[in-house]
Amino acid sequence: MDDGFAYTTIGHRGLTICNPIGSDELDSIVSLIVTSGPPTGRALDIGCGKAELLIRLCERSGWAGLGVDPNAAFVAEARAAIATRAPGRVEILEGTADQLSHATYDVAAALGASHALGGTEPALAALAGATDPGGHVVFGESFWRHPPGAAALEVLGMPADELGLLHELVATVDAAGLEPLEVVVAREHDWDRYEWAHLRNLEAHARSHPDDPQAARLWARRERWRDAYLRAGRDLLGFALIVARRR
């Protein structure tokens, strides 16, 4: 398995939500969509991971969903969950957004997947283009909690312009022709649980594969990020889900 997919796949073992948003917060987003959308809508999730957003949406409504993700392991887990929780309601494709038709949806989402769409602004343009007028976009993106200093940026290995502050992120959503309706920010303890679960999974994998060079590489990568997270990321990085209506 490619190191990139292996790192993500192993790190997310046992996790259904592939970002630091808590389960209650995801539920609040689903409730907002269900109560303000049509009774039988269609939802698209690009970079859907294990499709938890789509599954919850279809569990609680008459909606149907389509998700796409390039990670074969995530696709398999998503399909298994759909078979028991939302059979026949959600379709998952293994691949990228390039493979999708130009159909539009009542909801288009990308949670932490803007990199797959060329960055924040191109991702928002793609989501707006995939959403019917009056429909919803759900956009998950990282942001700076406060302006980053040079020392923290060096620890994280990130340029200052890679992310914006939360108000700048919301303004970018607004500028894409989308009316922000709700912003849900990952709580610190949910992010901690996410990070440490990810770390435990990779540590367990390295322990159970002592002679595997890939396992050693993945664990070394995780140790580097653990250090960066504790020294700078925990204080500086935020993650938000933004629900917006297409104008």
PLM feature spans:
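A short SAM/SAH-binding and catalytic strip from SAM-dependent methyltransferases
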Residues: 107-119
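Short alpha-helix
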Residues: 162-177
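Conserved Class I S-adenosyl-L-methionine
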Residues: 184-247
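Conserved alpha-helix/loop element of class I SAM-dependent methyltransferases that forms part
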Residues: 19-39
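A short glycine-rich, Lys/Arg-flanked "PGG" loop and its adjoining helix->strand segment in the class I
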Residues: 121-136
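A short acidic, Gly/Pro-enriched loop at the edge of an enzyme's catalytic core
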Residues: 98-108
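Class I SAM-dependent methyltransferase SAM/SAH-binding core
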Residues: 44, 50-98
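Short, glycine-/aromatic-enriched active-site segment of Class I SAM-dependent methyltransferases
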Residues: 142-160
